[in-house]
Swiss-Prot record:
It comes from Lacticaseibacillus paracasei (strain ATCC 334 / BCRC 17002 / CCUG 31169 / CIP 107868 / KCTC 3260 / NRRL B-441) (Lactobacillus paracasei). Residues 1-22 have a biased composition (Polar residues). NCBIfam families: rpsL_bact. With S4 and S5 plays an important role in translational accuracy. The modification 3-methylthioaspartic acid is found at residue 102. The lineage of its organism: Bacteria, Bacillati, Bacillota, Bacilli, Lactobacillales. Belongs to the universal ribosomal protein uS12 family. One of its GO terms (cellular component) is small ribosomal subunit. GO terms for molecular function: rRNA binding; structural constituent of ribosome; tRNA binding. CDD domains: Ribosomal_S12. GO terms for biological process: translation. This is Small ribosomal subunit protein uS12. Keywords: Methylation, Ribonucleoprotein, Ribosomal protein, RNA-binding, rRNA-binding, tRNA-binding. Residues 1-45 are annotated as: Disordered. Part of the 30S ribosomal subunit. Contacts proteins S8 and S17. May interact with IF1 in the 30S initiation complex.
Protein backbone atom coordinates (compact mmCIF):
# COMPACT_ATOMS: atom_id res chain seq x y z
CA UNK A 1 0.00 0.00 0.00
CA UNK A 2 1.63 3.30 -1.06
CA UNK A 3 1.77 6.34 1.17
CA UNK A 4 -0.02 9.57 0.22
CA UNK A 5 3.37 11.14 -0.44
CA UNK A 6 4.33 8.36 -2.88
CA UNK A 7 1.00 8.77 -4.72
CA UNK A 8 1.52 12.54 -4.96
CA UNK A 9 5.02 12.03 -6.37
CA UNK A 10 4.30 9.19 -8.82
CA UNK A 11 0.56 8.67 -9.11
CA UNK A 12 -1.22 5.56 -10.33
CA UNK A 13 -0.21 4.07 -13.66
CA UNK A 14 -3.19 3.32 -15.90
CA UNK A 15 -3.18 -0.15 -17.43
CA UNK A 16 -2.67 -0.02 -21.19
CA UNK A 17 -4.19 -2.92 -23.12
CA UNK A 18 -2.58 -4.35 -26.23
CA UNK A 19 -4.71 -4.96 -29.31
CA UNK A 20 -5.48 -8.59 -30.23
CA UNK A 21 -5.48 -7.68 -33.94
CA UNK A 22 -3.00 -4.82 -34.40
CA UNK A 23 -2.99 -4.79 -38.22
CA UNK A 24 -6.63 -3.59 -38.24
CA UNK A 25 -5.64 -0.40 -36.39
CA UNK A 26 -3.68 1.18 -39.24
CA UNK A 27 -4.39 2.79 -42.58
CA UNK A 28 -1.83 3.73 -45.22
CA UNK A 29 -1.11 7.19 -46.58
CA UNK A 30 0.39 6.55 -50.02
CA UNK A 31 1.32 10.20 -50.47
CA UNK A 32 3.47 10.24 -47.34
CA UNK A 33 4.25 6.50 -47.55
CA UNK A 34 3.42 6.11 -43.87
CA UNK A 35 0.97 4.26 -41.65
CA UNK A 36 -1.88 6.31 -40.20
CA UNK A 37 -4.14 5.65 -37.25
CA UNK A 38 -7.28 4.38 -38.98
CA UNK A 39 -8.94 1.54 -37.02
CA UNK A 40 -11.40 -0.66 -38.92
CA UNK A 41 -13.47 -3.77 -38.07
CA UNK A 42 -12.36 -5.51 -41.29
CA UNK A 43 -9.72 -4.91 -43.93
CA UNK A 44 -9.30 -5.93 -47.56
CA UNK A 45 -6.18 -7.68 -48.75
CA UNK A 46 -4.63 -9.87 -51.42
CA UNK A 47 -3.68 -13.49 -50.69
CA UNK A 48 0.03 -13.93 -51.33
CA UNK A 49 0.20 -17.55 -50.22
CA UNK A 50 -2.42 -20.24 -49.51
CA UNK A 51 -1.51 -23.43 -47.68
CA UNK A 52 -2.00 -25.74 -44.72
CA UNK A 53 -0.30 -25.90 -41.35
CA UNK A 54 -0.42 -28.31 -38.44
CA UNK A 55 -1.78 -27.20 -35.04
CA UNK A 56 -0.01 -27.29 -31.67
CA UNK A 57 -0.16 -30.33 -29.43
CA UNK A 58 -2.41 -32.12 -28.53
CA UNK A 59 -4.41 -31.41 -31.72
CA UNK A 60 -3.80 -32.92 -35.12
CA UNK A 61 -5.13 -31.66 -38.46
CA UNK A 62 -4.23 -29.73 -41.60
CA UNK A 63 -5.62 -26.25 -41.00
CA UNK A 64 -6.06 -24.04 -44.06
CA UNK A 65 -4.51 -20.57 -43.94
CA UNK A 66 -3.63 -17.70 -46.24
CA UNK A 67 -0.87 -15.13 -46.03
CA UNK A 68 -2.55 -11.80 -46.83
CA UNK A 69 -1.06 -8.42 -47.79
CA UNK A 70 -3.56 -5.88 -46.48
CA UNK A 71 -4.53 -2.54 -48.02
CA UNK A 72 -2.27 -0.88 -45.43
CA UNK A 73 0.67 -2.98 -46.74
CA UNK A 74 0.95 -5.07 -43.55
CA UNK A 75 1.25 -8.80 -44.22
CA UNK A 76 -0.64 -11.14 -41.86
CA UNK A 77 -1.57 -14.82 -41.59
CA UNK A 78 -5.33 -15.48 -41.68
CA UNK A 79 -7.33 -18.66 -41.08
CA UNK A 80 -9.77 -19.92 -43.72
CA UNK A 81 -12.81 -21.31 -41.84
CA UNK A 82 -15.22 -23.97 -43.10
CA UNK A 83 -14.89 -27.08 -45.22
CA UNK A 84 -13.30 -26.46 -48.63
CA UNK A 85 -12.38 -23.10 -50.15
CA UNK A 86 -11.72 -21.50 -53.54
CA UNK A 87 -8.83 -19.24 -52.57
CA UNK A 88 -5.59 -19.06 -54.48
CA UNK A 89 -2.74 -16.61 -54.85
CA UNK A 90 -3.91 -13.07 -55.82
CA UNK A 91 -7.46 -13.68 -54.52
CA UNK A 92 -8.93 -10.53 -52.94
CA UNK A 93 -10.16 -11.33 -49.42
CA UNK A 94 -11.75 -9.57 -46.45
CA UNK A 95 -10.24 -10.29 -43.04
CA UNK A 96 -11.59 -9.77 -39.54
CA UNK A 97 -9.97 -10.16 -36.15
CA UNK A 98 -10.12 -13.39 -34.18
CA UNK A 99 -7.27 -15.74 -33.44
CA UNK A 100 -7.04 -19.51 -33.83
CA UNK A 101 -5.91 -20.91 -30.49
CA UNK A 102 -3.97 -23.90 -31.79
CA UNK A 103 -2.21 -22.13 -34.69
CA UNK A 104 0.68 -19.93 -33.49
CA UNK A 105 0.80 -16.53 -35.19
CA UNK A 106 -2.71 -16.71 -36.70
CA UNK A 107 -4.66 -13.71 -35.32
CA UNK A 108 -7.14 -13.11 -38.15
CA UNK A 109 -10.01 -14.89 -39.93
CA UNK A 110 -11.01 -14.60 -43.57
CA UNK A 111 -14.68 -13.63 -44.03
CA UNK A 112 -16.44 -16.30 -46.12
CA UNK A 113 -18.87 -15.10 -48.80
CA UNK A 114 -17.18 -11.68 -49.18
CA UNK A 115 -15.15 -10.46 -52.20
CA UNK A 116 -13.38 -13.41 -53.93
CA UNK A 117 -14.08 -15.89 -51.13
CA UNK A 118 -17.05 -18.19 -51.80
CA UNK A 119 -19.36 -19.36 -49.02
CA UNK A 120 -19.33 -22.95 -47.79
CA UNK A 121 -21.38 -25.28 -50.03
CA UNK A 122 -24.07 -27.43 -48.41
CA UNK A 123 -23.90 -25.62 -45.08
CA UNK A 124 -27.27 -25.80 -43.28
CA UNK A 125 -26.55 -24.56 -39.76
CA UNK A 126 -24.58 -21.50 -38.68
CA UNK A 127 -24.80 -20.29 -42.28
CA UNK A 128 -24.15 -16.60 -41.62
CA UNK A 129 -20.67 -17.33 -40.25
CA UNK A 130 -19.73 -19.16 -43.44
CA UNK A 131 -21.40 -17.02 -46.12
CA UNK A 132 -23.86 -19.75 -47.12
CA UNK A 133 -27.17 -18.79 -48.71
CA UNK A 134 -30.47 -20.15 -47.41
CA UNK A 135 -31.28 -23.40 -49.23
CA UNK A 136 -34.24 -23.44 -51.62
CA UNK A 137 -37.44 -25.08 -50.32
CA UNK A 138 -38.74 -28.01 -52.34
Amino acid sequence: MPTINQLVRQGRKSISTKSDSPALNFGYNSKKKSLTNNPAPQKRGVATRVGTMTPKKPNSALRKYARVRLSNLIEVTAYIPGIGHNLQEHSVVLIRGGRVKDLPGVRYHIVRGALDTAGVDGRMQGRSKYGAKRPKKK
